[in-house]
């Protein structure tokens, strides 16, 4: 794949207006569980040897053209949000070059201490119309580290793989990832899956340490039915991959209390998803999500 337009990307990654409006009219205005003081626990990320918080602070809700919902709240509010999440155990930040949040994450890590945080970012390796063209891997990784005030990246993913040919199409990048991993610049490598075929290949591919996959009970904004996707994630987990869930709330389609609860329960109780990333924009959302997750994890 050499180019993808905005419409195609939205269809694949589900950063659409409908999802934005669902959140704007739903999740943001719902009542939330009050904070009890519960802390997010840590879990093993597959067989990578890495322990991570069960919940990551996502920074790319409706991310496109170097912006996202988290970027739009502004640097000061984002850093406050990240500090609050950190204080409650969410010491795992998920970002990407496309979201435009690298520098916000860098400011947050400077405040809480880089050594205390797991950092995941993603690199886009194909063109987007006239506004994005991939740099060389070395130029990108140097820029990422500068933007985020870090010497190393815990998890680096190929962003938005949309077909089963990705190991052939992006072998050069995969080799670059592996070389950087050998040098200690990256600790774990993998991909974010936005296609069922891409996910099936990733589950068996020995190169990938980590899979970021869309999963919820409903099938909203997913790459297949919940049953089919969960079967692939089980295979990936059996193969030692670290599995990170995304689109837990269906990119805004599953915002009612009972929907959020059911989706979290489905993912946590499956045993096939190690941890998850959720794009939160307020302290109330952070507290509510932590309360729900930890009650389920401890039940």
For each predicted feature, which ranges?
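Short, acidic/polar
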Residues: 70-84, 133-147, 194-201, 259-266
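A short, structured active-site edge motif that brings together acidic residues
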Residues: 116-129, 159
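Beta/alpha (TIM)-barrel catalytic core signal, keyed to glycine-rich beta->alpha loops juxtaposed to Asp/Glu
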Residues: 161-299
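Active-site mouth loops of central-metabolism enzymes
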Residues: 61-75, 123-135, 254-256
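Alpha-helical scaffolding within the catalytic cores
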Residues: 38-43, 102-104, 137-144, 195-199, ...
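N-terminal binding-site loop/beta-alpha segment at the start of enzyme catalytic domains
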Residues: 2-117, 266, 270
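Active-site groove signature of glycoside hydrolases
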Residues: 148-164
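Acidic (Asp/Glu)-rich catalytic clusters
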Residues: 47-49, 106-114, 145-149, 203-206, ...
């Amino acid at each position: 794949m050499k180019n993808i337009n905005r419409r195609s990307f939205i269809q694949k990654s589900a950063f659409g207006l409908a999802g934005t409006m669902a959140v704007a009219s739903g999740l943001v205005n719902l009542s939330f569980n009050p904070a009890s003081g519960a802390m997010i626990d840590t879990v093993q990320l597959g067989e990578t040897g890495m322990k991570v918080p069960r919940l990551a602070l996502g920074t790319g809700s409706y991310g496109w053209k170097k912006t996202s919902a988290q970027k739009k709240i502004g640097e000061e509010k984002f850093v406050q949000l990240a500090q609050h999440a950190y204080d409650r155990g969410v010491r795992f930040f998920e970002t990407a070059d496309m979201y435009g949040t690298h520098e916000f994450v860098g400011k947050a890590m400077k405040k809480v201490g880089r050594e205390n945080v797991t950092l995941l970012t993603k690199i886009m390796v194909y063109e987007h119309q006239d506004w994005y063209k991939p740099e060389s891997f070395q130029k990108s990784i140097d820029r990422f580290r500068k933007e985020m005030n870090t010497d190393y990246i815990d998890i680096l993913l190929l962003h938005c793989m949309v077909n089963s040919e990705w190991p052939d199409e992006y072998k050069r990048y995969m080799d670059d990832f592996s070389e950087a991993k050998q040098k200690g610049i990256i600790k774990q490598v993998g991909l974010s899956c936005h296609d069922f075929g891409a996910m099936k290949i990733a589950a068996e591919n020995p190169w990938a340490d980590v899979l970021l996959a869309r999963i919820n009970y409903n099938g909203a904004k997913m790459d297949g039915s919940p049953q089919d996707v969960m079967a692939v994630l089980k295979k990936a987990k059996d193969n030692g991959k670290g599995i990170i869930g995304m689109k837990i709330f269906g990119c805004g389609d599953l915002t009612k209390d009972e929907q959020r609860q059911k989706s979290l329960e489905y993912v946590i109780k499956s045993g096939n998803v190690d941890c998850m990333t959720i794009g939160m924009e307020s302290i109330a959302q952070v507290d509510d999500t932590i309360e729900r997750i930890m009650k389920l994890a401890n039940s």
